[in-house]
């Protein structure tokens, strides 16, 4: 079973993720959390007269073998896999040609961005927004994102702004693109090298596209163009994957350098200003929509009645209150961001106890809230874990069989040896990780909730089943002085410092200039692919009815 509930935490402005591309042949994972979008408005420059020269044809010479898994060549003074160098060189020529044939949609510093490249980024932003809306519908029964799935971005106004969704998407494109290129350029200048696993991930994305194209009996370029638009080549698409991989690696390395630069006294000084900001609490939250029956709500006095009330009053028969109302461990700020400051204030009020229940007027609704675990300062914990990942296409019966098989192994240990040493043997023989140190957020929340419950004792064990997989956990103990707030504050300080650095470089060398005539053509071009995607959504919706 996969360990992480979410991907690596973002730094200040992490370069756009390279996963979840909506190209045929690439499986798109369900969005794990509702995406909150916050972007900066792009800065515009007076149009420059000088234009980039056609790229020179670079003959790629491989470097001498050094025993590495991959064959390398040089790209602008930096060692890269030869496949990457060839793709980047080809993409540079393709981009130049696309600018001449389809027009320059944007200029980012001294880079020209063609209409096809803009459409690629724009369509992906659109796609992620639709995933967010679909997730909202899945979790709450309603689309709370403000984005209409069946209207074009140019046809609908953003609910919190004075402009259309197309402008929102354009701002995101500019920010993502500028940051990707800026961090990539910095990475190349710094001589950053990717790990073998990162290189493999990029090459696998190309192989996925190739398999998808083969299944449709067309070329990779045709596959890419069908998803995005005419003029976008496979090399241009893959160049972005490479750019993002290096940008992300450099972002992570620079962030880590900042983190390592802070002393404990630096961190403690921040913590002492407001310790409550670094505590976490676990509660259930149910939005009371429609008619509010105060008498009915007042009869809810425990967790069982809370869940019964939520299941009874939710409009969807398939609603699972036990899963959906569970928040996991959240800080006051995070809770306030999701439900409103009133909910955060209630949860972290002095004297709050487990079992407390209230109706709180929050950001969007009245919320019925139930306190599971009052606020505390979490630490890392040592555990052993062995799990089974469920395939998303598994039937309920197959999942049941997988769980029963895993549970049988767990019970054989539990009812037999039952010791820590025995669990280690059981875990490692079943491809477990042995002993590991974990923090809140490292596992799916069902597992997280069990591990980090303050009542947990050394030697506790459990077999847990989740929507993603099942796993057996052995609790070794809590690391008393290894508080999460130490890590949180260091990462926050590093994020702020990295953000300042990024903004300084972006403002100096990557300011954006729009070509509005070409952008209008780009919107029309993107609409063709968006309409195709909307048709697929409609067909899927009909099938689910």
Label each region the model flagged.
Residues 123-131, 174-193, 204-218, 242-259, ...:
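Sec-exported extracytoplasmic/periplasmic mature domains
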Residues 296-342, 404-447:
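Peptidyl-prolyl cis-trans isomerase
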């Amino acid at each position: 079973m996969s360990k992480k509930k979410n991907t690596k935490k973002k730094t200040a402005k992490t370069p756009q993720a390279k996963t979840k591309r909506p190209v045929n042949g690439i499986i798109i994972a369900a969005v794990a959390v509702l995406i909150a979008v916050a972007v900066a408005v792009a800065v515009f420059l007076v149009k420059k007269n000088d234009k980039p020269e056609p790229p020179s044809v670079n003959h790629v010479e491989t470097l001498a073998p050094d025993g590495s898994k991959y064959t390398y060549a040089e790209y602008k003074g930096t060692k890269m896999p030869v496949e990457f160098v060839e793709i980047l060189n080809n993409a540079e020529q393709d981009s130049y040609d696309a600018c001449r044939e389809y027009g320059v949609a944007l200029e980012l510093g001294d880079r020209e961005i063609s209409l096809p490249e803009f459409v690629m980024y724009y369509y992906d932003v659109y796609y992620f927004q639709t995933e967010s809306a679909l997730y909202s519908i899945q979790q709450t029964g309603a689309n709370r994102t403000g984005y209409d799935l069946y209207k074009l971005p140019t046809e609908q106004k953003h609910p919190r702004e004075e402009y259309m969704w197309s402008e929102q998407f354009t701002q995101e494109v500019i920010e993502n693109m500028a940051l990707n290129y800026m961090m990539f350029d910095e990475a190349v200048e710094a001589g950053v090298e990717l790990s073998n696993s990162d290189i493999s991930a990029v090459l696998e994305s190309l192989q996925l596209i190739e398999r998808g194209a083969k299944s449709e009996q067309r070329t990779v370029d045709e596959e890419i163009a069908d998803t995005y638009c005419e003029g976008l080549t496979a090399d241009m698409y893959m160049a972005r994957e490479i750019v993002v991989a290096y940008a992300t690696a450099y972002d992570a390395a620079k962030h880590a350098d900042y983190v390592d630069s802070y002393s404990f006294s630096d961190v403690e000084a921040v913590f002492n200003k407001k310790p409550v900001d670094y505590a976490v609490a676990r509660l259930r939250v149910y939005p009371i929509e429609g008619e509010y029956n105060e008498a009915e709500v007042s009869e809810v006095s425990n967790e069982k009645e809370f869940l019964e009330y939520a299941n009874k009053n939710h409009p969807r028969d398939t609603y699972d209150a036990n899963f959906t109302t569970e928040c996991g461990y959240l800080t006051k700020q995070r809770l306030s961001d999701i439900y409103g400051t009133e909910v955060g204030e209630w949860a972290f009020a002095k004297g709050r106890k487990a079992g407390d229940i209230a109706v709180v007027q929050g950001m969007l609704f009245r919320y019925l809230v139930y306190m599971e675990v009052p606020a505390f300062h979490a630490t890392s914990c040592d555990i052993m874990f062995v799990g089974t990942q469920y395939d998303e296409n598994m039937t309920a019966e197959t999942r049941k069989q997988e769980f029963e098989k895993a549970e049988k192994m767990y019970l054989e240990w539990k009812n037999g040896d039952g010791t820590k040493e025995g669990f280690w043997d059981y875990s490692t023989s079943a491809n477990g990780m042995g002993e590991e140190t974990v923090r809140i957020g490292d596992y799916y929340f069902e597992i997280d909730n069990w591990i980090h419950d303050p009542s947990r004792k050394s030697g506790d064990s459990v077999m847990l089943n989740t929507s993603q997989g099942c796993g057996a956990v052995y609790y070794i103990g809590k690391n008393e002085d290894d508080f999460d707030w130490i890590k949180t504050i260091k990462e926050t300080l590093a994020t702020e410092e990295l953000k300042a650095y990024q903004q300084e470089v972006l403002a100096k060398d990557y300011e954006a200039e729009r070509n509005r005539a070409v952008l209008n053509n780009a919107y029309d071009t993107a609409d063709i692919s968006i309409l195709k995607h909307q048709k697929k959504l409609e067909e899927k919706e009909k099938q689910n009815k």
